[in-house]
């Protein structure tokens, strides 16, 4: 395919949108999935105030805006804002006319049917795309790791899923979801930093805490041992400079924050941690494929980027699994973008070309065509 008919691959995350062209090895555009609106009329006088700002522009003007994420827990909840994000993706980030390109979108596992239909409808009716497809995020991550069978623990900003996949097909009966991911960890870090005497409350300050989390947090192999070490020495302490120049010190919060992934009770949640959820997904799968799942446990998404997370998963799952079972955790270095990369790979395959939903098929069958063609 030449660039004129290049396929667009858009991975809409709850926190970040990743977009680019199929065949590339990384997304061209990565920006926050946020829409900001001025807090007060006329507040931004002389700046040719717009009624809304998207992505990085919204982030840079965050002090004057109220920021909203149109996706919650991986599901689109505000369609008007989502359209603004897609519009921004096409016209400002990729600088393409969507009516000239097939578009591959990604979706959360167990995405409600109505949600998939609405995505399909907007692509064909609002953006007039010639063809589109919706792929499950975890399956794309598995492709990126060069596998078609395995279990993906995909954790982004909005949710965490454990998805067993056999020969390219996600197994919905064994797919589990945890409404605990990056955003909850950011909120938790805000809370425990407040206990240290630092105040973070606004949506703008939430973005600062997210940055602290991404730069300084890590997963301890043994959190109790780490707590004892943090209490007796300053070896885990790090400093961070806030935008106003104030420097703050952060200690055991560095590992207490992501520890909530393994102990959701830290957040007052009754659910199992990511290790137990992964194990439960494997046990819900057919007994004949469990061995393949244990040896092909793939981490994916920004919330799996903490240093130490793979070792800890290895330790925890080994403790849960039958003792004879070999456990292998795969943590690809660029796993933050592995969903997007999987989309880029899939859309480039010659065998995939007959999978597209064409405009003609859409016109004949309506939005429900998505359930027949994308599964």
Swiss-Prot record:
Matching entries from SMART domains are given as: ACTIN
Superkingdom classification of source: Eukaryota
Principal localization? cytoplasm
PTM-bearing positions, type N6-methyllysine: 84
Coiled-coil boundaries: none
Which GO terms fall under molecular function for this chain's record? ATP binding; protein kinase binding; structural constituent of postsynaptic actin cytoskeleton
Expression by tissue, per the entry, reads:
Expressed in some hepatocellular carcinomas.
| Signal peptide feature range | none
Give the location in the cell: Cytoplasm, Cytoskeleton
Q: Name one GO cellular component term.
A: membrane
Chain positions found as Methionine (R)-sulfoxide: 44, 47
Q: Please verify whether the record's keywords include Metal-binding.
A: no
Gene Ontology process terms (BP): axonogenesis; cell motility
User: What PROSITE patterns is this protein classified in?
Assistant: ACTINS_2, ACTINS_ACT_LIKE
Keyword terms, alphabetized: ATP-binding, Cytoplasm, Cytoskeleton, Methylation, Nucleotide-binding, Oxidation
Processing after translation = Oxidation of Met-44 and Met-47 by MICALs (MICAL1, MICAL2 or MICAL3) to form methionine sulfoxide promotes actin filament depolymerization. MICAL1 and MICAL2 produce the (R)-S-oxide form. The (R)-S-oxide form is reverted by MSRB1 and MSRB2, which promote actin repolymerization. Monomethylation at Lys-84 (K84me1) regulates actin-myosin interaction and actomyosin-dependent processes. Demethylation by ALKBH4 is required for maintaining actomyosin dynamics supporting normal cleavage furrow ingression during cytokinesis and cell migration.
Instruction: Report the family membership.
Output: Belongs to the actin family.
Q: Subunit composition?
A: Interacts with PFN1 and PFDN1. Does not interact with PFN2.
Return the protein name: Putative beta-actin-like protein 3
Organism of this sequence? Homo sapiens
